[in-house]
Amino acid sequence: MIFLITELGNVEFDKNNFKRCKFKDIIFKDCIFNANVFSKCIFENVSFENCRFYKPDNINIFSDECIFMKIIFKNCNLENSVFKECRISDLKFIESTLEHAIFSNVLIENNQISDCDCRGLKIINSTIEKFRFEDKNITKLDEYVFIDTIKLDKKYKKSYEEVARVYKNISKKLEENNLINHASEYYYLSKCIEHKSLTGIDKINSTIYWLLCGYGERPTYALITSLEIIFGFAVLYMFTGLSISGNVVNYVEVFSYNFSERNVVTDFMSCLYFSTVTFTTVGYGDITPLNLSVFLSAIEMFLGLTMTGIWTATLARKITR
């Protein structure tokens, strides 16, 4: 069935089952849609103005490969509406209510949300491309909003870039709604996805940024990296030489002469102690670096100052937010 009426106003659609219908070049004004099911329907160049798709305990369902092309929902109530297995392209939600609406297994292409109420919105197991917010005021989001891991085509670099941009847009909008913890998680996801699209020096820089502090969102990463540096330098000091109370620890020489007389655990703990005080720039002076260890200790002190600053800044940022 094809609907080619140019305009419908003040019409109530109650508990209908629309199957394989095509709605084209139609303007719905002040209409009420109550408990309707749209299956395998096509909506093309259709505008809904001041329409209501919600009554308590009666929701509208769009499912089974419904297609939306060049659609506008303006000042509509789509609360609790369900969009399942649909293709949604060039669709605009303007000053509408999408509270607790569910989008499941949908393909979303080049869609826009402007000044809408999206509290409790769920997007599950879907592919999203070019999804953006264009607000004069602020689209409302809350802690119950859930955007599932977005599907992407791993064969195309552009797919990673688009998904990263979507996550960044969501993060920015959550931050505007003072949902800082949620915003930081979506920002972290955006950076992880963006990392996969990078090459060369940009990818190296991104990897370092991730290892150091999880793109500024993971203070524990800075702590773990610091511990790895301390342990790594402790091992190096065992082979480059330290003077401990007149005794020299240098396992390059030990391997050449008499290994059996050395207490490896005690020597390693001494090197670990020296590495720790060097990294934290405390330095009690009871252990003296020898030969190459002097140069290594200078490097470790610089890394210690840097990592302490990164860890402190990242932790403070998370706490204050």
Label each residue range with its predicted role:
Residues 160, 195-205, 265:
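Short, membrane-interfacial amphipathic segments enriched in basic
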Residues 200-242:
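Transmembrane alpha-helical segments and their cytosolic interface motifs
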